[in-house]
Amino acid sequence: MIVVRDTETLKGKRLVATIGFFDGVHLGHRFLIHELKQVAEAAGLPSAVITFPEHPRAVLHADYQPKLLNSFEEKLKHLASTGIDYCIVLDFTLELSRLTAKEFITTVLADRLHVDTLLIGYDHRFGYNREDGFEQYVTYGEACDMRVIKASQYSEGEAAVSSSEIRKLLAECRVEEAAHLLTYPYGLKGSIVSGYKVGRKLGFPTANIQVDEPFKIIPGIGVYAVRVYLNGQRYKGMLYIGNRPTLDNGDNITLEVNILNFSGNIYNNEITVTFIQHVRGDIKFDTLDQLIDQLKKDRETVDRILTE
């Protein structure tokens, strides 16, 4: 996949393209992209996904804090895995947001990006205030010799697959269901920072994680079985998200992972965790001994899950 930021490099090319934010690059997105590749192959033209590095709502509303499934780099990696020819990166600006659908199709898709065929997601709308629909897009495309077609709808069972639904699953700790819809386990990347070192005193040393991407969604509170990627190696991990009620941590939410069968100083290292299964919710224990007993059970559960 060739990532295109300078659209001048597309001169002389004709493309079969689709457009969207593609957060998560989930099953629904992959279904659309598969159809895109089929249309492109039939036309004998390269396939292209047009996307944005920033969430459009974050540009339009300064106080909006998106909760995303992917950083931009992760999104590019997952798009590349689909086998498309080009990923065209457009900066979503206020000026771009003010273009009507007709202006966008004419000046951006046709004149600037040389789109021959535009495949539209079955429920996708674009242009200022999303005022127009598919029928209007077809008319605007015909005026500049562009074919506009609507993609088939994809559903998983009776439910449509959406980034919003996957975010909801993660917030509800349903990481296995989220992984199925994403086609990969959800992950977080961050730096290991110094904590209170309470876990070490309890016999469960933990690495406290400061997530690199502030807009990425944090799954719901609880204990998880996770895969840990550190210094080129993969480990089993027991990860906790919460405010440590037994230790009176206030309202501060922490992410800390106990790496099974590992010892060593790893502060300031980069770490990635991928969520495999939710083990339990948060519990406030009356004593530290009760907490330690539960952590021993949790570690056995995590080890079994990650060994299966």
Language-model-detected regions and their locations in the chain:
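Residue-level signal for inorganic ion chemistry
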Residues: 26, 79, 118, 178, ...
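N-terminal Rossmann-like or analogous alpha/beta NTP/dinucleotide-binding catalytic cores
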Residues: 58-144
